[in-house]
């Protein structure tokens, strides 16, 4: 049975004026029309839910775990939450990430989330010839991103738009090679309604493709 995990990386989780949220809501409406009624869809809102960051508590916990030492209550709590996030991610086989573009990169909470799921021996492993992804079982990834500028004109802005490069590289590294991005871009320089309509068409096609794979 297919399980879809929505990863909402917008700081204003349910802001209906947000372009990326509008495009996501349109995608979800279309997607639900294509998939069976009993198919599971879960959602994690990174700016509402607890998503641990790598800080001194996490580093201390990892060091103690490696040495077989007892964790403090705080360390135990944070590592349990990180494990919950990891297992939720691993249990899905279709992913949808929703994000705005912030200073040419992903929102900070999405980076924290990536640090929770990129775990050796869980989503990748080390070998004598290099690291190998452990999620090579046909998983699919859709990224829905909104931006005021345009980043596909093969110019300076294309070079410094790191969010797409980072996400694609990291998920490919984990073994998720079916990766697609839908950009609602140019909202500050183009007709916003035209940008939305173009993105709506793209996510409708993406919804059909993901549901029928």
From Swiss-Prot:
FMN binds at residues 18-20. Gene3D superfamilies: 3.40.50.360. It is an enzyme of class 1 (oxidoreductase). InterPro entries: Flavodoxin_fold, Flavoprotein-like_sf, FMN-dep_NADH:Q_OxRdtase_AzoR1, NADH:quinone_OxRdtase_FMN_depd. One of its GO terms (molecular function) is electron transfer activity. Binds 1 FMN per subunit. Its EC number is 1.6.5.-, 1.7.1.17. It comes from the Bacteria. It catalyses: 2 a quinone + NADH + H(+) = 2 a 1,4-benzosemiquinone + NAD(+); N,N-dimethyl-1,4-phenylenediamine + anthranilate + 2 NAD(+) = 2-(4-dimethylaminophenyl)diazenylbenzoate + 2 NADH + 2 H(+). Keywords: Flavoprotein, FMN, NAD, Oxidoreductase. Its cofactor is FMN. Quinone reductase that provides resistance to thiol-specific stress caused by electrophilic quinones. Also exhibits azoreductase activity. Catalyzes the reductive cleavage of the azo bond in aromatic azo compounds to the corresponding amines. HAMAP family: Azoreductase_type1. Homodimer. Belongs to the azoreductase type 1 family. This is FMN-dependent NADH:quinone oxidoreductase 1. It comes from Bacillus cereus (strain ZK / E33L). The gene is azoR1.
């Amino acid at each position: 049975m297919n399980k879809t995990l929505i990863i909402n990386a917008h700081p204003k989780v349910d802001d209906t004026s947000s372009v990326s949220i509008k495009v996501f809501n349109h995608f979800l409406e279309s997607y639900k029309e294509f998939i069976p009624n009993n198919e599971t869809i879960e959602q994690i809102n990174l700016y509402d839910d607890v998503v641990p960051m790598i800080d001194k508590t996490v580093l201390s916990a990892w060091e103690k775990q490696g040495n077989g030492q007892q964790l403090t209550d705080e360390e135990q709590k944070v590592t349990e939450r990180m494990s919950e996030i990891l297992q939720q991610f691993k249990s899905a086989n279709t992913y949808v990430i929703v994000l705005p573009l912030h200073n040419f990169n992903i929102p900070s909470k999405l980076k924290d989330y990536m640090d929770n799921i990129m775990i050796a021996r869980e989503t990748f492993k080390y070998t004598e010839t290099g690291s190998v992804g452990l999620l090579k079982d046909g998983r699919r990834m859709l990224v829905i991103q909104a931006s005021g500028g345009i980043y596909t004109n093969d110019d300076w802005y294309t070079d410094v738009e790191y969010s797409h490069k980072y996400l694609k590289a990291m998920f490919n590294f984990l073994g998720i090679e079916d990766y697609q991005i839908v950009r609602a871009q140019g909202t500050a320089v183009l007709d916003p309604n035209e940008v939305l309509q173009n993105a709506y068409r793209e996510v409708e096609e993406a919804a059909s493709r993901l549901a029928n794979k």
